[in-house]
Amino acid sequence: MFDFSEKSRRYQHQLNAFMTQHIYPREEEYTAQLHAAESRYGYLPIMHELKAKAQEQGLWNLFIPPSLAEFSDHGGLSNFDYAPLAETMGRVLWSPEVFNCNAPDTGNMEVFMKYGTSAQQAQWLTPLLAGEIRSSYAMTEPQVASSDATNVELSIVADGDQWVLNGRKWFITGALYERTRIFIVMGKSDPHNTNRHKQQTQVLVPKGTPGLQLIRPLTTLGYDDAPIGHAEMVFDNVRVPLDNVLLGAGRGFEIAQGRLGPGRIHHCMRLIGAAQRSLELACKRVTSRTT
């Protein structure tokens, strides 16, 4: 039906084999480790093991598009060619992390590739590409309709050689995860600019920065999505160096548009895979139940 490239077809075959051999047979083990872990948001041993296997087989950072292929030995796939891979990964909700293709890291890595300085890339992109750390993207807020990025209210104010952040964010994916090290935070730095698309700025806030408070975990439809999860956060006079800005003051909306587009496609493809797997499991249950 679709004419995928030879490279995409090769990865599809390899990924399907990996899922069959290493992922599907260990779903119950993953769940058992999650429930037995000391921390609800800790890094599970099975994930460490499976990531090493995926990296050895070259099933790593496959989301990186051709325009950014210089950042990886793998990937180099268009969204069209990557779509069936994302769909396959979505068949097991936690499996994208195995291949370093999990949100929000994929979008955040693209932000660093497209808009980060060489110093920012060395500090944050390199370990993200290696799967050594995780990251979060802090845009959504409780008091505004955050689907329109121009609505964000968190303030970002320059004070000497620092940015000062004050405000609240919530449903921030990965904020509680023990391997998360960096937040990309979007706020309003120039609220009186007549161009509403030039009012926003994005800055980097390392986890553990004074004034950055993780208030509580949040659920979606009753699920906490551990171990990654979602959190409510407060920024109380959080200070970071001016060099932590991405692309420049007033460029935050521009970054958001460049980041969120591909991510929405990836999410949709993964959800198609999850829906297909759910249907398959339901059909299997219907034909195999005895009571």
What are these regions (language model features)?
Residues 2-6, 10, 213-291:
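Glycine-rich beta->alpha junctions and the first turn(s) of the following alpha-helix
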Residues 58, 85-90, 186-189, 205-210, ...:
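Short Ser/Thr-interspersed hydrophobic loop/turn segments at strand-loop and sheet-helix junctions
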Residues 131-140, 185:
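A short, Trp-centered hydrophobic/proline-enriched beta-strand micro-motif
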Residues 1-101, 119-127, 134:
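Amphipathic, small/basic residue-rich leader segments at the start of a protein or domain
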Residues 154-157:
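A structural signal for short hydrophobic beta-strand segments in well-ordered beta-sheet cores
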Residues 97-119, 148:
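N-terminal glycine-rich flavin-associated loop
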Residues 161-162, 166-215:
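A short core secondary-structure module
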Residues 145, 170-177, 262-266:
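Glycine-rich phosphate/pyrophosphate-binding beta-alpha loops
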